[in-house]
């Protein structure tokens, strides 16, 4: 009875162990591949719990999401014979799920060692062998990442389709200490030179700013002077126009006044000519004699009152001449002398 219990216990233990080894779990972002007797099975499984034949079947979980493979301490010899070392090179890659079986079959589940690690060593040595230390360490260092990525992806496209390289990151290589100090000194001198150049640019910029400021001030003064000069010219032109208008008005007034006086004189002359009739002249003659306070007696006095046609005509002409020139108000003096 005791032996039967022992057998049952052993059988139960074996069954539990078999069941435990048969049940396995695949994480999210992974694909399970199976081996039976060392041979890779064509079946794969996705995330979750799965069963397999215990003891004779084994599995490996292959990651299909983004992963970073680190290649450390990669030696590299330059064309000048200087040996340098890259401390760490990071390769970001992912595996397409439907390509898992083919890649694991051809390169095992540790495909990254054959396809990535070895390729990194090869490409870096190829790159360093055709470039100098100056180019690798300074001039072309920023191109190493992209060159490695392109070279890896080009080979993987033909050798292992489905393995995609997303990025490659390369750290600064370690160089011999003496050379490193020389580079540091060179970088220090270059930095000083850049600082001096920047200071010179700042000084030139300040001088240019001052020059532009002075130019703006000069233009401002010139514009103000031009505006002031224009105002003065406009004032002078306005004064000139006002003077011309005043002169024209004065000339027009004087001309109108002269024309009026001339017209008045002409009208007075015409009126006087119309008044110089013989009767009017005779009347004026009598008035002049009557108003004269001095009368000289002689033999010619009686003739003064004679209505002689010849004498009256001459006297009328003389009187008309006097009256025509505004002398109608002068007293007429008559004097007779004894011969």
Curated annotation (Swiss-Prot):
GO molecular function: cholesterol binding; ubiquitin protein ligase binding
Entry's transmembrane regions: 4-24
Cytoplasmic side: 1-3
CDD domains recorded: SPFH_like_u3
Bilayer topology annotation: Single-pass type II membrane protein
Chain ranges on the Extracellular side, renumbered to this chain: 25-339
Positions of modified residues (N6-acetyllysine): 267
GO annotation terms (biological process): cholesterol metabolic process; ERAD pathway; negative regulation of cholesterol biosynthetic process; negative regulation of fatty acid biosynthetic process; regulation of cholesterol biosynthetic process; SREBP signaling pathway
Domain of life per record: Eukaryota
Localization annotation: Endoplasmic reticulum membrane
Modification(s) after translation: Deubiquitinated by USP25; leading to stabilization.
Main location: endoplasmic reticulum
A Pfam family per the record: Band_7
Annotated glycosylation sites: 106
Keyword terms, alphabetized: Acetylation, Cholesterol metabolism, Endoplasmic reticulum, Glycoprotein, Lipid metabolism, Membrane, Signal-anchor, Steroid metabolism, Sterol metabolism, Transmembrane, Transmembrane helix
Region (Interaction with ERLIN1): 177-309
This protein's GO CC annotations: endoplasmic reticulum membrane; membrane raft; protein-containing complex
Family listed: Belongs to the band 7/mec-2 family.
Subunit structure: Forms a heteromeric complex with ERLIN1. In complex with ERLIN1, interacts with RNF170. Interacts with activated ITPR1, independently of the degree of ITPR1 polyubiquitination. Interacts with SCAP, INSIG1, SREBF1 and SREBF2 under cholesterol sufficiency conditions; indicative for an association with the SCAP-SREBP-INSIG complex. Probably part of an AMFR/gp78 and INSIG1-containing ubiquitin ligase complex involved in ERAD of HMGCR. Interacts with TMUB1; TMUB1 bridges the association with AMFR. Interacts with SYVN1 and RNF139. Interacts with TMEM259. Interacts with TMEM41B.
Role this protein plays: Component of the ERLIN1/ERLIN2 complex which mediates the endoplasmic reticulum-associated degradation (ERAD) of inositol 1,4,5-trisphosphate receptors (IP3Rs) such as ITPR1. Promotes sterol-accelerated ERAD of HMGCR probably implicating an AMFR/gp78-containing ubiquitin ligase complex. Involved in regulation of cellular cholesterol homeostasis by regulation the SREBP signaling pathway. May promote ER retention of the SCAP-SREBF complex.
Record-given protein name: Erlin-2
């Amino acid at each position: 009875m005791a032996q039967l219990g022992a057998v049952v216990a052993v059988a139960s233990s074996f069954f539990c162990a078999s069941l435990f080894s048969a049940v396995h779990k695949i994480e999210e972002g992974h694909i399970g591949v199976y081996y039976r007797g060392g041979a890779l099975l064509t079946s794969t499984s996705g995330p979750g719990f799965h069963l397999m034949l215990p003891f004779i079947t084994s599995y490996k979980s292959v990651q299909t999401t983004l992963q970073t493979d680190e290649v450390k301490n990669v030696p590299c010899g330059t064309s000048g014979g200087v040996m340098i070392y890259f401390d760490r090179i990071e390769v970001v890659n992912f595996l397409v799920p439907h390509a898992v079986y083919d890649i694991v079959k051809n390169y095992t589940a540790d495909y990254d060692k054959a396809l990535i690690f070895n390729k990194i060593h090869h490409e870096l040595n190829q790159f360093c062998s055709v470039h100098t230390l100056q180019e690798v360490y300074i001039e072309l260092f920023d191109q190493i990442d992209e060159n490695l990525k392109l070279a890896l992806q080009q080979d993987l496209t033909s050798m292992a389709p489905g393995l995609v390289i997303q990025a490659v990151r390369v750290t600064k290589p370690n160089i011999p200490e003496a050379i490193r100090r020389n580079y540091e000194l060179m970088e220090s001198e270059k930095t000083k030179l850049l600082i001096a150049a920047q200071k010179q640019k700042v000084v030139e910029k300040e001088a240019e700013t001052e020059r532009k400021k002075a130019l703006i001030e000069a233009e401002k003064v010139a514009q103000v002077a031009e505006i002031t000069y224009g105002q003065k010219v406009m004032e002078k032109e306005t004064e000139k126009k006002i003077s011309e208008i005043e002169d024209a008005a004065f000339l027009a007034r004087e001309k109108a006044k002269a024309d009026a006086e001339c017209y008045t004189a002409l009208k007075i002359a015409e009126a006087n000519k119309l008044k110089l009739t013989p009767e009017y002249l005779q009347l004026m003659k009598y008035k002049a004699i009557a108003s004269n306070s001095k009368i000289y007696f002689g033999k010619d006095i009686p003739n003064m009152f004679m209505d002689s046609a010849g004498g009256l005509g001459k006297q009328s002409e003389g009187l008309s001449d006097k009256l025509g020139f505004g002398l109608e108000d002068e007293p007429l003096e008559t004097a007779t002398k004894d011969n």
